[in-house]
Each structure stands twice: as structure tokens, then as C-alpha cells.
Amino acid sequence: MAFVSEREIVRKIFSKKIDFTILAFFYISSIFFLLCSGVLFQYFTAAFTKGNCYECSMKLDYIKQFYFSLETAWYLISAVAVFIASVFIQHRIKAYLTLLAITWIVLTITDVALIHALDNIAMNNILLNILYNLFGAILLSLFMCLSNSLLFHLNKIKHIPMILSAMIPLVSAIIIAILITAVIYLLFARQAVEIEMDISEGSDIAYVGVKDNEESFGFLNDKKTDTPTYLDVIKNGSLIYNDTQGLSGADIYIVSGCYALPDLLRNVPLDAKKSFLNVKKLEITQKLPMMGFIQGESADVMPKAASRLSLSKQDDKFMLASSVTDSQIKFKSNNAQLMVAFAFMPITTNGILHDYTYDIIINDKKYKIENHVAPLSRLDKNKKMKCEYQQISDLTNTYNINANYLTGFLLVLKPDDIINYNNSPSVLLKTDFAFYKKTYQKLDKIYDDISNGKLSSLRATGISQFSINGKHLSLRPESEIIISEGSLYGLVNKSKKIKIYGTADLVFVDNKIMNLRKITYLQSKLEIFGSSIMDILKYIFGLGLLAISIKFIHSYFKNDVNENLFL
């Protein structure tokens, strides 16, 4: 059959609308499944690292996202474009080269659009996609040409209805997609491993506990403490003191000219006439960052998201530090005195604020604090800090503070002597993000503030001891460990060391996954089918599969006939 113009093919399509619709459905579905399986193949073979596989799993739910998700839905556009190009197939070799070029371009445009949407524009990603797309276009174009020839033979020569003929490419595409997925599963599925690690000086871990905070591993999870807890409240801090009996006393000060540190806040002048009595509730809310400390009889951190824990040594003291996001920390009084002190860090995206206000609400009565802070000069840097105090009382509702350097507040909260074990007065800190830490003179005192409990995942550096299935791994101080989807337990052992151990489903050490299933596991899976890895290699190379394929493709394209389905 001679070459026919595209206009003539379009005219024929309009005369065979039903066949075109049937063909469009089955072809587009076939191309889509093949493209999705290609995405799966590229994802695991090209970039199987912590960056894109932190939560990956070869479970069914994870595999499904490569075929049925918003990201892969974009490839429907590519599938439609490739199908439209295939409609105009006439002579085999010309059609193949045209399809190859169009498929390569369409896939590259789609990938660039997705990379841009995911804000991951890097030249290495684009170049890698171009190479994979070329490989995919070569195979997909061959599939389309072979499918077209098969449909032409069945529909035009054997006169089998289009709806039955068009099912064959779809069934073939589904089988190919299943085979690719199965191979990826056998090669990249993970094997759960037993891990054990020590957290020592210099360690820094970010971790996620379990939903029940009482069962979670953590720092200051409902622990008695007689030393201050230092806090850097970075975002949206709210302090609430509650005394259900309403019998507490409170001395409240506006502090300026110094940081809120226990060593600086000494010999605070007290005017008993300005003390507040019968305090039931006290609240301070501030969006500005603030730094200070809270000292109570016990502390209970209630994280809602990932926490962080680091152990370090500064001068002659050890420090245990952590951070929380969107969380609460409760400091209980156990009917002893509570002290709360914070200095504001008036830093915004537009610079440093010199004028700002906040409210102190006591028993629903508002006291407005207006701050006017002079800028810090070069000469002031050499001056010794001196705290200045202004005690507030219920007689004045508004206070104007002209200060140097810093302003903040000091709360001295005095519960009644009547002991209420079930619900003693407490201070609750709510924050979107905060750091908290404690210092210790002796290392062994640190472990009193650690709660034994469960973890589900972690990211760690500075780990001194780490083993997988009993095998010790040699690590550098900067080596990074990532464990996800695990059943872990953290505790302080008899030797006064913090240990984390348990079962992990995903383990990375310095970007390298450590728990891929061994080749012996793949061997055992193949033995179920009465085969082995060597058998497969024999089939591939012993039968000369590659040579046979090349010979078939050569003979196929040599017979360059016109096989358009609508002519």
C-alpha cells in the first residue's frame, strides 16, 4: 500500500469513530501501564537512596502509588500523545523512528514538568531522566509498532473485531508491568534486621516515639527534677499556669537589661504589697522568640511530632538537649514554688523590633506591657549585664518599659501549702517549635532524666557503637544512620549507657541501604518455581536470546509494509 497523507487518515478515523474509541481506550491504558512500570524501574535502579526512599516499602500500598497516584496520572497525557502519534503509523521503520522521537520528547517534557512541580530542578536529575527516557522510548516505540502489526493482522486480515483485537496489547502491557514489578520486588525488597546502638557524648538523634507518650522513649517524659530546664521557644510560645483551687500567690516582675538566667536573677527585690493572691490562672502568649528557664518539681514533655536528642560536653558540664515541634511541656509544682523566667528575642523577618507589646492575663484580667528597647551599641558590649526589675500589681493595668538590650518577665509562683497529689498547680508551655536542655555536673546524672520506651524511627549522627544482626559496623563521627518503620526500644542500661535496639525494616548508613534481601533470598524464591539464578542466566545466554531478538527485529523492519489500521 502506498503512502497516504495524514489528512486522509484523519478522514478515515471520522468514518470509523467506534473503532477509534475502542482503540484509544485499550492503547492509552497499555501505554500508561508501561510508562508507570518504567517509572518504578527508574526509581529503584537510578536513585535508590535515603533522599527518595526514606519511607519506601515494597508492600502493596507502596507499589500501588506508582500506578495509581496524582504524580503518575501525569503520564496519561504522555500516553495520549504517544497514542495519537501511533494512529498515523504506516510503514514500519519510518513509523518506529517517528514514534521514538515523539515518545522521547513527550516523556522528557513530562518529567521536566514534574521535576519543576516538585521543586527538584537539578541538572543531574534532568540528564538522568533524558537517558532513561531514551531507553524507554526505544522499547515503547517497538511495543507500539509490534502491537500495531498484530492488530492489523487480526483485524484487517483475520477480520477479528477491534474490541477483541485491541485487548491483546493491554493484556501484554499488564503482563510486562507485573513482570517488571516482580523483578524490582525480588531485587529491592528489604529484610527486617536486628539493630543495636549506643548514644554517647557527641551523639545527636532525631526520633519519633509512639502515640502513647507514657510508653515513648524520651528526655523529661514525666521526670522529677530539681534543676532548671532551659528553653529556647522559637515560635508561638504560650505559658499557662493553672491552680484549680485558686489559692496560689504570685510575684510578677518585668525584667530588663539581662538574659533570663538563674545566675543573673538573684536578690530580686520583693514588695509584698504588690504580690498577687488567690491566683487561679495566669497566661502569657507571645509570637516572638524567647529564651529562659522553668524550674519546677517535675517536667513532662508531650511531643506530637519528631523530637531531637543530643548529648554534649561544654566546659566542665555535660548537656542533654532536645527539641519539639507542635508540642506541650508541663512543669508540675507538687505544691512547691515554681519559677518561670524568659527574655524576648524580638527578631522578625524584617529585622529587630525595638517596640513591642504583650499581655499578662491573671484571673482573666489583662495587664498590658509596652516595651521600648534601645539598640545595643558597641560600647555596651563590654559592659556587665545588670538586671533591672519592675514588679507589677493589680493596681495598674498598663506598663511602659524603657530598657536597654532585652526585656522579659519573671514569675515566682507559690502554690498553697495544702497538698493536692492528684492535680497540683502546674505551668504548661505550648509551642510550635522549641529547644530545651539541662546541664549536669556528672555524666551519670543525665540518665535519671531519660525515660525508657519505644521509638518508631530515628535519624542519628555521632553514634559510637552500631551493629546490624550482631555484626559491628565501623562508623565515622559524621556518619548518618536512618532507621524507619521499625519496632525499637530505648533504655538506660545497668552500665549507665543509653541504648537503642530492636527490629528495623529500613536501615541506611551514609546513604547506603543496609538491609536489602540477600541473593540467597532471591535464590530461595526462584526455587519455589523449580528454577535458580544460574538457570535463568543459562536461558538468557545459552539460547542466544539476544541474538534471536536482534534477528527478529531486523526481519520485522525489513518487511516495510503499510499497516495503518484505518486505511
Curated annotation (Swiss-Prot):
Q: Which cysteines are joined by disulfide bonds?
A: none
This protein's GO cellular component annotations are: plasma membrane
Keywords, comma-separated and alphabetical: Cell membrane, Membrane, Transmembrane, Transmembrane helix
The name of this protein is: Uncharacterized protein YfjW
Protein localization:
Cell membrane
Q: Which domain of life is it from?
A: Bacteria
Q: Report TM segments.
A: 20-40, 69-89, 95-115, 126-146, 168-188, 528-548
> Which membrane topology term applies here?
Multi-pass membrane protein
